[in-house]
């Protein structure tokens, strides 16, 4: 039976560390950290995600600023909202909830966010910082995956890692983080020929394919660590990931569950980016390695 890569347990630990830091530094800063989440439209999944983020903020003492715009909001008005949040001195982190409604191009809107307040780590400047190994906000889901690997004693150094998916949200930054940790990395995608031939070579397999239960036992090398980034609602009810967990858990050495794996750590890394930005703005003593073990 595979080791369970439990994101909930790790998320609680990191949240406790963040809460302790906030309580210690609150008087010196004069205000709590602030996270603004901008949601456009009425996508039900996005509404759930935003509610979860607001609850996480409340648990650790981060002020939450929510903006919800109608789905037919023109791009200029969304841009004005971002600029207002950029100028708000009580906001340390800004998240533009994706996906956006049709007609809104996420690229220019993400670029409009102040890079120092980019809580999701998706601004071009911060992706460049990641590429160069410089400090800055990190993409939340890949950063959460790296924390899960570390906390379970899985060192990517010298290992073969395969990332399925090449999105700027997960796949590309995930590959960069694994490479920075001295793994030999392959990115696979929808046009990859003979996918299983690549994935069966992986010591670490990160699946962000966006396809329900796409990866099965035939794709997994015995003893591999498998991280399932996907989350989907089944027609008959319940949730599943991109991995057929019942097949893979008997082969893999480690497997992240869905739900309860990557999802909680994605939210927690959003809080980490926000709190670290708050510390930097107020010159507060902090150590990222102490916050995320």
UniProtKB/Swiss-Prot annotation:
Binding site for NADP(+): 165-167, 190, 231
Residue ranges of the TM segments: none
Pfam families: THF_DHG_CYH, THF_DHG_CYH_C
InterPro entries the UniProt entry points to: Aminoacid_DH-like_N_sf, NAD(P)-bd_dom_sf, THF_DH/CycHdrlase, THF_DH/CycHdrlase_cat_dom, THF_DH/CycHdrlase_CS, THF_DH/CycHdrlase_NAD-bd_dom
Secretion signal, residue range per the UniProt entry: none
An example molecular function term from Gene Ontology annotations: methylenetetrahydrofolate dehydrogenase (NADP+) activity
Superkingdom, natural source: Bacteria
Disulfide bonds: none
EC number, UniProt record: 1.5.1.5, 3.5.4.9
UniProt record, GO biological process: L-histidine biosynthetic process; methionine biosynthetic process; purine nucleotide biosynthetic process; tetrahydrofolate interconversion
GO CC terms in record: cytosol
UniProt keyword Hydrolase present: yes
Catalytic reaction annotation: (6R)-5,10-methylene-5,6,7,8-tetrahydrofolate + NADP(+) = (6R)-5,10-methenyltetrahydrofolate + NADPH; (6R)-5,10-methenyltetrahydrofolate + H2O = (6R)-10-formyltetrahydrofolate + H(+)
Record key words, sorted: Amino-acid biosynthesis, Histidine biosynthesis, Hydrolase, Methionine biosynthesis, Multifunctional enzyme, NADP, One-carbon metabolism, Oxidoreductase, Purine biosynthesis
Pathway terms, separated by semicolons: One-carbon metabolism; tetrahydrofolate interconversion
Entries under PANTHER family matching the protein: C-1-TETRAHYDROFOLATE SYNTHASE, CYTOPLASMIC, C-1-TETRAHYDROFOLATE SYNTHASE, CYTOPLASMIC-RELATED
NCBIfam families linked to this entry: PRK14186.1
Physiological role: Catalyzes the oxidation of 5,10-methylenetetrahydrofolate to 5,10-methenyltetrahydrofolate and then the hydrolysis of 5,10-methenyltetrahydrofolate to 10-formyltetrahydrofolate.
Stated family: Belongs to the tetrahydrofolate dehydrogenase/cyclohydrolase family.
Assembly: Homodimer.
Protein name, per record: Bifunctional protein FolD
């Amino acid at each position: 039976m595979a080791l369970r890569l439990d994101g909930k347990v790790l998320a609680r630990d990191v949240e406790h560390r963040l809460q302790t830091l906030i309580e210690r530094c609150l008087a010196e800063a004069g205000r709590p950290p602030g996270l603004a989440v901008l949601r456009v439209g009425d996508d039900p999944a996005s509404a759930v995600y935003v509610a979860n983020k607001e609850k996480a903020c409340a648990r650790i003492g981060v002020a939450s600023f929510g903006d919800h715009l109608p789905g037919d909001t023109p791009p200029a008005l969304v841009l004005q909202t971002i600029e207002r949040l950029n100028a708000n001195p009580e906001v340390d982190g800004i998240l533009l909830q994706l996906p956006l409604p049709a007609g809104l191009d996420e690229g220019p809107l993400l670029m409009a966010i102040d890079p120092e307040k980019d809580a999701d780590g998706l601004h071009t400047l911060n992706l460049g910082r990641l590429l160069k190994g410089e400090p800055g906000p990190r993409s939340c889901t890949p950063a959460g995956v790296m924390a899960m690997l570390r906390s379970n004693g899985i060192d990517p150094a010298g290992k073969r890692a395969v990332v399925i998916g090449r999105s700027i949200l997960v796949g590309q930054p995930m590959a960069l983080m694994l490479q920075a940790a001295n793994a030999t990395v392959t990115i696979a995608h929808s046009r990859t020929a003979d996918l299983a031939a690549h994935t069966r070579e992986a010591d670490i397999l990160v699946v962000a394919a966006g396809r329900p239960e796409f990866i099965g036992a035939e794709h997994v090398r015995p003893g591999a660590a498998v991280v399932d980034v996907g989350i989907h609602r089944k027609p008959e009810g319940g949730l599943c990931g991109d991995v057929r967990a019942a097949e893979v858990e008997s082969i893999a050495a480690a497997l992240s569950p869905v739900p309860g794996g990557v999802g909680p750590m994605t939210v927690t890394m959003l809080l980490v980016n926000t709190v670290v930005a708050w510390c930097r703005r107020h010159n507060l003593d902090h150590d990222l390695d102490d916050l995320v073990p």
